[in-house]
Amino acid sequence: MAKEKFERSKPHVNIGTIGHVDHGKTTLTAAITKQFGDFKAYDEIDGAPEEKARGITISTAHVEYETDARHYAHVDCPGHADYVKNMITGAAQMDGAILVVNAADGPMPQTREHILLGRQVGIPYMVVFMNKVDQVDDEELLELVEMEIRELLSSYEYPGDDIPIIAGSALAALEGRDPEIGEQKIAELMKAVDDYIPTPARAVDQPFLMPIEDVFSISGRGTVVTGRVERGVINVGDEIEIVGIRDTKKTTCTGVEMFRKLLDRGEAGDNIGALLRGVDREGVERGQVLCKPGSVTPHTKFEAEAYILTKEEGGRHTPFFANYRPQFYFRTTDVTGTVTLPEGTEMVMPGDNLKFGVELIAPIAMEDGLRFAIREGGRTVGAGVVSKIIE
């Protein structure tokens, strides 16, 4: 059977369901696919296969569907730990999320934790589905729960007053009954997602950035750096900066080649070699990035949200304490750094997720939301994301 051609006509957006255990995330996911995609039964989604991202095992279900306006890729995780790992490793990048809250319970501990994580790892937009409304008889109670959700979102710097909240029953939609709280509400939810969660800028439209993987010297031509263009476009003749590890340097790209052919440009997703003017072989190294001047700056101090692997995942067998000094693997290279634990935390156990401070011994081209691995002698022991740059 030939693979169906992927229709590129509609804008593509990545979203996911988040929220407390048993509030109905997977039921909602199934209900959406029933109305807008190839129907996936609850069990198909819930029995998500395990996959490895940065050496960490995560169970994630991927479904896709489309509205009139857009094509969506949607992730749903069976367990709370899977969400934490997913959000921190960025295994499934989300442009926005549907926060599912049981109307009868209101916000619960994991509701709060997922909102906080969303804020820390840079999920820019959320839409709320208040589920299981058929279990609440009292209209006033629904209003109270809605108020509580809005306040909670605002306390984590989401615009709680503006976020669309749709109240309905995912199960009713899935079972095809009570359309006024079922099907109609799923349609209303997807309309809100269409309207409220903006289409992200495509990678080629963002400022140019390429992590340097290798450096070669070509006699008579100069220095070539190779890597995969992460975003943006580079044209021959563009002025660019080399950022990270050493002082930032300006240079000009005098050539772009791919598969040994000369091109006039390279764009997001391309593996290229870029010829740099006036830079010698010793003047540039793996771990630095090429970027549009002024778009990214080098930093050594930041706050991070991290997940520490369990022994079973191949991580540490013992806890670590203040002043722990592992390597932080950013893009293509390891840099040693010192960890500062938050007030009141004495030690960190394998399997924990937490926020901590890091100071690197050399600067790295860094932005909020940049992912990294925590390593000890080449072995991955954790994963993290830069939540706030300090200096």
UniProtKB/Swiss-Prot annotation:
GTP hydrolase that promotes the GTP-dependent binding of aminoacyl-tRNA to the A-site of ribosomes during protein biosynthesis. It is found in: Cytoplasm. Keywords: Cytoplasm, Elongation factor, GTP-binding, Hydrolase, Magnesium, Metal-binding, Nucleotide-binding, Protein biosynthesis. It is an enzyme of class 3 (hydrolase). It comes from Dinoroseobacter shibae (strain DSM 16493 / NCIMB 14021 / DFL 12). Residues 169-171 are annotated as: G5. One of its GO terms (molecular function) is translation elongation factor activity. Residues 55-59 are annotated as: G2. It catalyses: GTP + H2O = GDP + phosphate + H(+). Residues 76-79 are annotated as: G3. Residues 131-134 are annotated as: G4. This is Elongation factor Tu. The keyword Nucleotidyltransferase does not apply. GO terms for cellular component: cytoplasm. Residues 19-26 are annotated as: G1.
